[in-house]
Amino acid sequence: AAGASFVRAEGFVFAAVADEGLLANACAGELLRERKRLGAESIKIYADLRKKHSSHALTADLDMAAWVRAAEFFQADGMIVTGTETAVEPDSAELAMARATTKLPVLAGSGATPENLARIEVP
């Protein structure tokens, strides 16, 4: 009813400790089942990779490519690389690694601005 073309999923893959507490369970399976139940398969799911305002000590041994492969495996339609917190720009190397790992769309998320986009988008 909202007319949305996509949703952004913060906890699609892997656990994290966030400002709102422990996010122990990734939501990929639950979200995909709910999308199907609603008959909303046309609504794309964009997965946040390394949610902002979070500690990723639980997944510190995973590089950005591993996050991308997991999101692909769990059928994300696209991915978002964000800064570590609001107004902190995404890391250009992580953005480049994500894009080199997948053919799916990868967006620069939180922290990307018109002023810094040209710099962080450099491959």
Language model segments and positions:
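Alpha/beta enzyme core
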Residues: 1-104, 108, 114-123
